Structure formats: C-alpha cells, structure tokens
Regions:
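Acidic/polar, glycine-enriched structural segments that form the non-catalytic walls/loops
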Residues: 1-47, 142-156, 163, 221-234
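Aromatic-lined, polymer-binding surfaces characteristic
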Residues: 8-12, 16-19, 24, 30-37, ...
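Secondary-structure transition/capping residues
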Residues: 37, 68-69, 87, 131, ...
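Aromatic-rich carbohydrate-recognition surfaces in CAZymes
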Residues: 61-69, 73-180, 206-214
C-alpha cells in the first residue's frame, strides 16, 4: 500500500503502450527504490548520497512524494559547510557524528539546493520549509593545492534556515567569480564530472554553469519576493 501511494498519483495515456507502462508507476518506483533508497545503478554502486544527484532525483518527487523530497532537501542542507560549499558525496553511517564524505571545488553542486527549493515552493508554496533550521558542517577550507579532501568534518553549532542555506550556496558561487570571458568559473566541475580538471587552476569557465546559475538566480528572485526579502529579489 505504501508503494501504491508513492507511485500512483501520476498517470499518462499515450499511443505508445511501452511509454505508458514505464511512466505509470515504474519511473517513480525506480527513482525512489534505486536512486533514493539504494543509491545504486549499473554505472555507480557505491551507496553514497550525492549532493546534486539526489536533489535532482527528488525533483521528480516533489508533487508525488513530498515527505521524501522534503527529507532530502533538509539532509542536503545538513551537508553544507559554513562557507557555503558542500560535500559532493558522503556515506551514511547511522551515527550521531557527521558522515565521512568529500569536500571539493565542484561548483554546480551548490546550485541544486536553491533550484530544488524553488521547485518546492512552486508546488507547496511557503509551507514552512524555508524557515526550517539546519546546522552546517565545519572543517578547514581546502588549501590552494587541494582539489578535494575525503574527511569526517565536525558538526557546526551554527543553525540557519533553509532559506539562508540556499543564500549561502549562491553567495559562494558569486564569490568564485567569473573568468576572462565573463562566464562562471567552474572549479572542478560543472555537472560534467569528466571535466573536473579544466577549472582546477581557477581559470576554467563554463557556459552551461553560467546558464544554470542565471536560471537559479531568476527563480530565487521570485522566491525572495514571495518571502518579503526585497533586497535579494531586486539584486
């Protein structure tokens, strides 16, 4: 019955039976069972949470499984560092201590948080999620010669709202600045992990990342306006 509730809200009818069969129940089932619960696939069987990965996944669940989507948004907020960057991935350990994970210079990860939260507000409005307090992670920032670090960070005593977590993520991307062509610096990734060394020295730029950041800023401006944050909305 639980599975029926999760996968039954969406149904399509097209002239293609195979497409109907997949979209009606199986697509949502696969998203929840494989991507969110098992976190495994033919190409990646590590079982870790990916910051960007599972935020993208729950984007498909906001309307149909809001409890699961909300839990993942809060989980990702809790894996953001005080400086605004995030753990690219981490392994759940079932303890009260922060999990081991990798801190990187990948830039697009950060932006999936405000993007997904903006999608949430389109469906559920200002329902209280943005005001939820969540703590940060704390560890030494990456040194100039560090591209990434696998570590167990500390849990920060600082709690801020989901709204502030999203703001910190965008401010972090803004602080990384643009390159000589006026495009966002990609750091060690812009969604395409195979390009992780292109921006490693600090000068690599990304057209895709610039497009995505522009989209996120546009959407977040609308969220800020609805929240009464006029300064952020106008910025």
């Amino acid at each position: 019955q639980w599975w029926h509730i999760q996968v039954s809200p969406m149904e399509i009818q097209t002239p293609e039976p195979a497409l109907n069969h997949y979209i009606n129940r199986w697509a949502l089932y696969q998203t929840i069972a494989c991507r969110l619960f098992a976190r495994a696939g033919l190409y990646q069987c590590g079982g870790g949470y990916g910051f960007r990965d599972q935020l993208q996944d729950v984007g498909a669940l906001i309307s149909t499984s809001p409890v699961l989507a909300r839990e993942q948004i809060l989980r990702c907020c809790a894996h953001q560092f005080e400086e605004g960057d995030v753990q690219h991935w981490w392994h759940p350990e079932g303890t009260d201590r922060p999990e081991r994970g990798v801190r990187t210079r990948i830039t697009d990860d950060l932006l999936w948080l405000p993007y997904t939260v903006s999608c949430w507000t389109e469906v559920w409005g200002l329902d209280g999620l943005l005001e939820e307090p969540v703590s940060y992670l704390r560890s030494p920032v990456l040194a100039k010669d560090e591209l990434e670090r696998y570590e167990r960070p500390e849990r920060s005593e600082r709690f801020e709202s989901v709204y502030q977590h999203c703001t910190r993520a965008m401010e972090c991307v803004l602080a990384r600045g643009v390159g000589e062509h006026g495009l966002c610096r990609m750091g060690t990734g812009d969604w395409n992990d195979g390009m992780n060394h292109i921006g490693a020295q600090g000068w690599g730029e990304s057209v895709w990342l610039t497009w995505f950041f522009g989209l996120v800023l546009e959407r977040w401006g609308a969220v800020a306006g609805r929240c009464g944050d006029r300064e952020a909305a106008e910025r």
